[in-house]
Each structure stands twice: as structure tokens, then as C-alpha cells.
């Protein structure tokens, strides 16, 4: 059996989007499950739209997610170069071959002529497509156009009456008719190949066995099959994954500001890469059974492309927050702290170069809220009461403090705290028990007034640990207020 070889081939026109990350991840899992190779190829022919640092950004956040590749930028490989702009001589070689065989031809029509043709077709109620006006130019006609200073594009001769059919990994049987396509451009006037031509040359020369991509590429597939046929090359196996939609079941748009869509943004919010990988894998793929939390190694072991969904994948941010919260609870504390500390520093609550004492305090703070956090950035909002000079009470808190027995409880608790020789959670727990014994109050009548008076909140993490971390002076000042 031939080696499984897949590719992720982004354009450096932007940063790593959640949809592109899913494409990369599914290719990665498919290859690793089969013991095959994943290739990273950069499709950088759209020079006007490429952004500075686009390639580096794609690579950085793929690696951050834990998606590694076997060949490509930073790895090398025997099928390079892996940037399309470094492969122009290869594309020219294969373009010349098609021209020599008569399977492609030069088209000298100007953009104005093409637009006029298109408008006339629309006016007649026809689907706009290239008419083939320059399909059979004589040598004299071509020479005349060249003399006018016209630069040609190169078009493929679309075969007549051919049905292009393939068995898609996701969509099953898919068919297109060649009559629905006009002769399309394979090389633009500037000599740069179009996507559907270059991608076939690259996939063939790089021995790509499976092409897994979004189903917005389905209409590209018959065009690519035309190129495979023109050279007599074998098709790879195609699989077109359903698109990602929002909760209103509309296609996820990069302009939709209500959804965070870039991997970099999630990293900057303190999400954990393992959690994001877990969530993205479940966007359009499902395992057997009800389990939802998996390690990358487990995903590699169980990944089965036949379980790719035929229905659009709904992007549920609450589900992502829940998954990340599970990882915040169970990942190593070092990783959770690393995802949280920068936010405390940015908020000015921990210095940029913390002392050992500050680090220990910050670690205790993150440990205190670890069970409540869904991502690192939340530590700032959750821990606000540690940094407020005056507490602001909501209606529920004021109701608690208005209780008849509250003054006696708070006064006794303050007295008990003043007698403590050690400021530890265990000692504070002892002070709470002593307050219970002295006042006769227990349960909510005991704990709620103490929590509200010291933290301003009716809910929160373990009370003795919270009080210990607040510090004795701050706690007594709040109790005496």
C-alpha cells in the first residue's frame, strides 16, 4: 500500500484561522493515524494579499497547537521547494507541455473585452463563462495581437461531454459536467499560475495521496481533475469537510466580530493549546461513544475519516470555554499558571519581573481560582476583590450583611483573627470554628457574613484560603469597616 501523504497548504494572506487550523489538524491526525507524512506547503502566489510575517505566524501557531509537519518550511524534504513562488520554473515546464500537446492555448483578450462578453451573456440570461473566442487562433492572429502589445493568459481546453465523478471521503459520490465550465485560465498574464493549476502540479510532484479540505473547494475539484487528465496523472483521494457555521447556522465569516476566530487570539486570552486542539477536532468529527476530552495521542489512535460529519459544524464558544475549563482543572499547574501570569502582570497586579515572594503569592492566587477559570485572562476579573480598597456590595450581599446576627459574628471573627499567631488557612479555619462556638451561629448564618464582609462576594473559592491570601491587615480593615 502506498504511503499516506497529505498536505496543509495555506496562503500567507492572514493569520491562522480556526477553519484553517481544523483543516491542518484533520490532515495531521489522518496522516499520523495511518503512519504517513504531513507536508506544509505555502501557496504564496497572491503577492498583493500576502502579509508580512504571514508564513511565520502560520508556522508558530500550528506548532503551538501541537501540529507538526514532516516536510516543508523549517523541515526541508526531497520534494521542495515548498513555496509556490520558488516553483515557477516547474509550472512553466508543465504549462509548455500542455501548449505543445494542444491541450492549452494562449488567450489575448483584454479584461475589457472579457467583461463585455460577460455582461452580454448575463443580458441574454446565460450563465457567464468564457466563450472560447481565442480557442483556435491562427499563428498570424497571435502575431497580430503580440504586435499590438497584448500579453496572453493561458487557458486549458475544457473537454466536451465529460462527467467528472469521484467518491469523496465525506460527500460520497460527487459529479460535475464539463459543459458547465468554460476554458479557464491556468496561467495569468503576469506568468503566475492560478490556484487550480499549481495545486495539481504540486500535489502530483509531492506524491500527495489524499486531499482533505473544506467543501468550499468542491467546485475546484473537477477543474483539478481536468489537469490530472491532461497529464495522465492519477487522482488523489479527495475529501471535502463541511464548513463551520455560527450558532445561527450561518457560514462563519471572518468579519463576524462576535466570535473569536484566530488561534493567536485564543493564545492571547490564556487558552491552553491542548484544549483548543481537543475542541477543534470535535468541529466536524465525532468519536465513538460519549467521551469528549481526549489527548492528542488518543485522537491519533482513534481518528477515522469515515466519521467526518456530513453536516456543518456549529462553532459553540460556550463548549470551547467548558473544554478549556476542564483542561485548566487537570493540566499541570505550571501550564495553567503560565497561561494566567501575563494577565496579572498586564493588569499591574504582579510586577513584570516578580520577586520570589510575588511569584508564590501569584501561584496561590491562580491555584485559588483554578477550578472556576475557563481561560487565563479570567484571573484578572475573578480576583478583583484582592486589589480593591473599598468593596462594592450588590443587592444579595447587602441582604446578607443586614442580618440581625451579623454584627456579633463579624466582631467575634475579627477578635479571633487578632489572636492568631500564624496566618495560615488551618489557623483561619480554627478562628471560624471558634466564632461558631462563641456566637452559636453555623452554616450560612456563619459563613455568608464572613465571606461577604471579607471579599464582597456571596460566592467564591475556599474561604480560609481566600482570607489567608488577602492578608491579615486587609481582612481586619474590612471587618472593622
Swiss-Prot record:
Superkingdom of the organism of origin: Bacteria
Positions of short motif 'KMSKS' region: 251-255
Q: What positions carry the motif 'HIGH' region?
A: 10-20
**Binding residue positions for ATP:** 254
Q: Recorded E.C. number(s)?
A: 6.1.1.17
**PROSITE patterns, sorted:** AA_TRNA_LIGASE_I
Q: Which GO terms describe its cellular component?
A: cytosol
Catalytic reaction annotation: tRNA(Glu) + L-glutamate + ATP = L-glutamyl-tRNA(Glu) + AMP + diphosphate
Question: Where does the UniProt annotation locate this protein?
Answer: Cytoplasm
InterPro entries per UniProt: aa-tRNA-synth_I_cd-bd, aa-tRNA-synth_I_codon-bd_sub2, aa-tRNA-synth_I_CS, aa_tRNA-synth_I_cd-bd_sf, Glu-tRNA-ligase_bac/mito, Glu/Gln-tRNA-synth, Glu/Gln-tRNA-synth_Ib_cat-dom, GluQ/Sye
One example of the protein's molecular function in GO is: ATP binding
| SUPFAM superfamilies listed in its UniProt record | An anticodon-binding domain of class I aminoacyl-tRNA synthetases (SSF48163), Nucleotidylyl transferase (SSF52374)
**NCBIfam families under this entry?**
gltX_bact
UniProt lists the family membership as follows: Belongs to the class-I aminoacyl-tRNA synthetase family. Glutamate--tRNA ligase type 1 subfamily.
Role summary: Catalyzes the attachment of glutamate to tRNA(Glu) in a two-step reaction: glutamate is first activated by ATP to form Glu-AMP and then transferred to the acceptor end of tRNA(Glu).
Question: What protein is this chain from?
Answer: Glutamate--tRNA ligase
Q: Which species does the entry assign this protein to?
A: Exiguobacterium sibiricum (strain DSM 17290 / CCUG 55495 / CIP 109462 / JCM 13490 / 255-15)
